[in-house]
Regions:
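Acidic, glycine-rich loop-and-beta core segments that form the ion-binding/anion-interacting portion
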Residues: 200-293
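Conserved helix-loop functional segments at active or binding sites
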Residues: 135-138, 172-175, 179, 209-213, ...
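Short, well-ordered beta-strand elements within core beta-sheets of diverse protein domains
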Residues: 157, 225-233, 361-369
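Short amphipathic alpha-helical segments with heptad-repeat character
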Residues: 112-119, 123, 130, 160-163, ...
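A helix-coil-helix interface module used to build multimeric assemblies
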Residues: 1-186, 192, 197-202, 211, ...
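Generic, well-ordered alpha-helical scaffold segments in large soluble proteins
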Residues: 33, 81, 85, 128, ...
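Glycine-rich cofactor/substrate-binding loops
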Residues: 1-22, 26, 67-71, 270-436
Length: 436
């Protein structure tokens, strides 16, 4: 996590101050539950809240870290620091609890807060893609398979595909958020022997989390693995859209391009350059997010009721993945919103192949109307198509001058096979399905 690829809204979730605030709230809400159980006198939790007051937003991080140098234990260091603020009531804090009750519940809360931001990012991205998709619903361009001209699509359809992909990602993230947003206050090995289930339920409700069904010393890591897997899928979708823009911005294609601002420079050596730097950057950032997926999977298999092998990994990749993904989504929003589209170049690229994009329509006409076998029809069409590739001839003219075709299809029929509106006849229905 570096400032260059961070937004403060997300980065602030992972600050020490925010982490210690959540730790305090977990401990204080547990005191409320202890009062309800009659384990401590009523009013103690209020005394603790009042003693801390607004300090919970501004705990002395350096002081806590100094204590940790001695304790070699972050939670004990925090509890020692907290005791200095709340005094005698500190003896009731953390009763029957273990460090993972604090660490895991806090991590769940941080990931829940991160998901809230990411869900908003996705909704804003979807709105921008939808707007541009309708803007170019009927903007015809060539579709490509294997990088080679295939048949026409519309630029709006391209964007509609990405809309549907990110809409699926939104549903995945909402489901994964629900799965990760859990609280576990279950004690040393998850048995609730020394801290009642009701304490966990109360803290969960106060934090806006669900109460974990069953835990060991830790929240099961399959929950985290699911969330980071979804992060990886979203990152791949970002790269998918970014790669499309990069290809379309190639000089010999130039059907769309990133906005190039006044004063922007593309190369220190070549003043003419306008490079797709934002989408290239997004492809790189996607790799960072995906790099968290395998470690998250490997964290699932902890020893018995818990070992600490997951901890160092999560301290690194939880902030890195969420901050990077948030930045990437916001950069992608900017790219799509300001994307330059060149319909004239799209038509020019269609025309440069001499009508080959209509080869399937000719094939089907020979099969269905001329009653020629599929094998023979394919051979006739391919023979003429190869002349276009090799000689630069016009496909339609070749067909009209081929006796095998002209004896079966009239010139008017052949002309109709090159009407590109045929390729757009289902666009409205597709849009209705995507944007229903």
């Amino acid at each position: 996590m570096i400032p260059r690829y961070s937004r403060p809204e997300m980065a602030n979730i992972w600050t020490d101050k925010n982490r210690f605030r959540i730790w305090f709230e977990i401990e204080a809400y547990a005191l409320e539950a202890f009062e309800k159980q009659g384990l401590i006198e009523k009013g103690i939790s209020n005394q603790v809240f009042e003693a801390v007051g607004d300090k919970k937003y501004d705990f002395d991080v350096d002081a806590i870290l100094d204590i940790e140098k001695t304790t070699k234990h972050d939670v004990i260091a925090f509890l020692t620091y907290l005791a200095g603020i709340i005094g005698e009531n500190s003896r009731f804090v953390h009763m029957g609890m273990t460090s993972s009750d604090i660490l895991d519940t806090a991590l769940s809360k941080q990931l829940d807060e991160a998901c809230e931001i990411l869900i908003d990012d996705l909704k804003r991205l979807l709105a921008v893609i939808k707007k541009r998709a309708f803007e170019h619903k009927d903007t015809i361009c060539i579709g490509r398979s294997h990088g080679i001209h295939a048949e026409p699509v519309t630029f709006g359809l391209k964007l509609a595909r990405f809309y549907a992909e990110f809409d699926r990602n939104l549903a995945r993230l909402e489901a994964a958020r629900k799965e990760i947003a859990v609280c576990a206050i279950s004690g040393a090995v998850g048995t609730h022997a020394n801290v009642a289930i009701e304490v966990q339920d109360h803290v969960a409700e106060k934090l806006g989390l669900e109460s974990e069904t069953i835990s060991s010393q830790v929240i099961p890591r399959d929950r985290h693995a699911m969330l980071f897997s979804v992060f990886g899928v979203i990152a791949s979708s970002i790269e998918n859209l970014a790669t499309e823009v990069r290809h379309l911005q190639r000089t010999e294609v130039l059907e769309a391009s990133e906005f190039f601002s006044k004063g922007q420079k593309g190369s220190s050596a070549m003043p003419h350059k306008k490079n797709p730097i934002l989408t290239e950057n997004l492809c790189g950032l996607a790799r960072i997010v995906r790099a968290s997926v395998v470690p998250a999977m490997e964290n699932v298999a902890l020893w018995h009721e818990r070992d600490i092998s997951h901890s160092s990994v999560e301290r690194m990749f939880a902030p890195d993945a969420t901050v990077t993904l948030d930045f990437a989504l916001n950069r992608l929003i900017n790219v799509v919103e300001n994307l330059l589209v060149y319909p004239q170049n799209m038509q020019k690229n269609i025309d440069q192949m001499g009508g080959l994009h209509c080869s399937q329509r000719v094939l089907l006409a020979l099969i269905e109307e001329a009653k020629i076998s599929r094998e023979d029809s394919y051979k006739i069409v391919q023979t003429n198509a190869m002349k276009v590739w090799e000689e630069g001839a016009d496909f339609k003219s070749l067909l009209k001058n081929d006796p095998l075709v002209s004896s079966k299809l009239t010139d008017e029929k052949i002309d109709s096979l090159f009407d590109d509106s045929h390729h757009l006849k289902s666009v409205d229905k597709i849009f209705d399905k995507v944007f229903k």
